[in-house]
Amino acid sequence: MIGAAGGMGLWTARHWFAELDDVARVTLCDVEPLSDKARDVISNAPASIEYVRAEYSTFGLSLVDWETVDSASNASLGWPEMSKMDLVVLAVPLSEIGTVMDGLNGQLATDAWLIDMSSVKTAPLANMVKLAGPGVAVVGTHPLFGITGNSITGKTVALVPTQTDDGSLIRWLDGGLQRLGAITMNVTAERHDRYMLIAQTMTHFALMAFGDAVTSSLQGDESLEELRQFGTPPYLAMGAVTGRLLTQNHGLYASIQHTQGAKNIREVFAESAQRLAKSFAEGSLDDIEVELDGLADRYGAAELSISTRLSEEMFRAGRVDPEDDLELMDS
């Protein structure tokens, strides 16, 4: 697993791959050393866990400084060699996939499996297929969740096939994830990327814009801490998610805003905000209600029902009563 000294790579190494009953050995590979915190995360894994440092040179990717990491099964299986790996997982940032593929430089066995975990699929998978080498099966994966909890049960992973796989790799991924209680979703690269522009790129941008607007609105001695005391359930929910985003990997979020189509999807969001702001400023209360009615119609009754249930579950989890939300009352 390349790029597995921390983040999603480390989490999935421990709670996905090391939990599979047909995986005996997981090798963590990274340019960064394995921290004490990472060693704690990976401890007591069912599979043998090893760490090897990655070095890049004009000759490609080399594996150095190998060590066995304490785990429930710590029997050494010998020095790891890239040419003998059954499965190679790219858990590196989107911007680094090209560098890693150049480093692999034909080192993979002709029957090896290769997957990635990036949040964009079309361009990375095309690059992987091009450079993986003859006979290598390539499939894309995208864990659609954050790094929380100690189990993959109930979490969703998107699986994206390529023409290099005869179905064996994607069936293995699908079967293993389902045995662990995860939810899988098979989707084309193009459809995945289109939906992620909305579900991820636009959503992140909206949260960043919300955080920027909130902090820009504070005056004098006003503070976020005091504002939170006045927080309605929607504000607390959006504020919490925005705050969480700001504590995560800023490089990752920056790369998501630079993916193909990101500029256009931000423009769609900005145009909608500007149109609604103009409509609300120039229209009557009835006009605003018409806008809301139209938006509700576009969502549809079924989606609104699901959204209401999910939001109420979220409010309860945050110990906030949705009935406490403030409404404008006609005085």
Regions found by a protein language model. Give the residues of each.
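ADP-ribose/adenylate-binding Rossmann-like module
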Residues: G106-P124
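Rossmann-fold dinucleotide-binding core
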Residues: V120-M185, A189, M196
